[in-house]
């Protein structure tokens, strides 16, 4: 056998060996996802507003997930911006039980707002639900396999949580959109002064309804962030018709800070 043939054969054997060694790891991560979905699904809720004069009465706004004692819910601050006490508009959270017809509706109230990081903490009534495990601060790593759960298209397809997979493509500094002149107040000015902070950039497609949903590690299920926004190619409507495939999440460390401040 020629020297070149021997070298090629050796290289091929090395490749097969590496593939065989790597295969169990990939299979393990994939096999874990169905169990994680079953575990996390009961803790993910739809967030919206209820008003007697509206049609439909429940207006979906985003996603949230249960933390701490089982009656607290984390979501994005922009998801609950429209709460209007004058018009008797109430915040409601909907707990999907796998069938939108059997969804459990809970009334909720704001416990704490962190507009600087676009986070909100709600307390909902009724019996507690399973709380999700929160990861360690600064726990996200580039290349980490992740998944997120929520209601990407709202109630259009029924209020059943949907799961998407992806990876952490970067830890990057992003500034939240600046308020308009009409929205300027003490908090808004404080947010501008704070400027940008680190976001988790995802190689995955999120949709408007995913806002406020949990981003979790694909192996452990621990929440490492809160889905926040999508990079748009054009108008807001293009998020559905021409998704960019780039999404962002707020690191869990700001959720931990918010929970500590609310105590």
Each PLM stretch: what is its role?
Residues 24-26:
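N-terminal signal peptide c-region/cleavage motif recognized by signal peptidases
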Residues 68-115:
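Catalytic-histidine neighborhood of serine endopeptidases
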Residues 88-93, 99-108, 144-147, 161-185:
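Beta-strand/loop subdomains of soluble extracytoplasmic proteins
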């Amino acid at each position: 056998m020629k020297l070149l043939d021997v070298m090629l054969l050796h290289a091929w054997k090395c490749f097969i060996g590496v593939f065989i060694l790597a295969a169990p790891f990939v299979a393990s991560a994939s096999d874990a996802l169905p169990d994680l979905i079953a575990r996390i699904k009961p803790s993910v809720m739809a967030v919206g507003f209820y008003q007697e004069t509206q049609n439909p009465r429940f207006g979906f706004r985003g996603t949230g997930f249960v933390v701490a004692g089982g009656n607290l819910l984390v979501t994005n601050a922009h998801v609950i911006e429209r709460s209007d006490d004058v018009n008797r508009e109430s915040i409601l959270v909907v707990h999907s039980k796998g069938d939108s017809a059997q969804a459990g509706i809970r009334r909720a109230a704001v416990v704490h707002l962190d507009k600087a990081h676009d986070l909100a903490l709600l307390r909902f009534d009724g019996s507690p639900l399973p709380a999700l495990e929160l990861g360690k601060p600064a726990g996200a790593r580039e290349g980490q396999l992740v998944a997120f759960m929520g209601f990407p298209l709202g109630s259009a397809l029924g209020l059943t949580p949907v799961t998407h997979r992806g990876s952490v493509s970067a830890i990057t500094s992003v500034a939240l959109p600046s308020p308009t002149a009409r929205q300027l107040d003490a908090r808004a000015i404080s947010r501008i002064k704070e400027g940008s902070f680190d976001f988790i950039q995802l190689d995955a497609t999120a949709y408007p309804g995913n806002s406020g949903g949990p981003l979790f590690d694909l192996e452990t299920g621990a929440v490492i962030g809160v889905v926040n926004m999508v990079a748009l190619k054009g108008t807001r409507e293009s998020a559905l018709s021409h998704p960019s495939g780039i999404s962002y999440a707020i690191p869990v460390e700001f959720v931990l800070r918010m929970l500590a401040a609310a105590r």
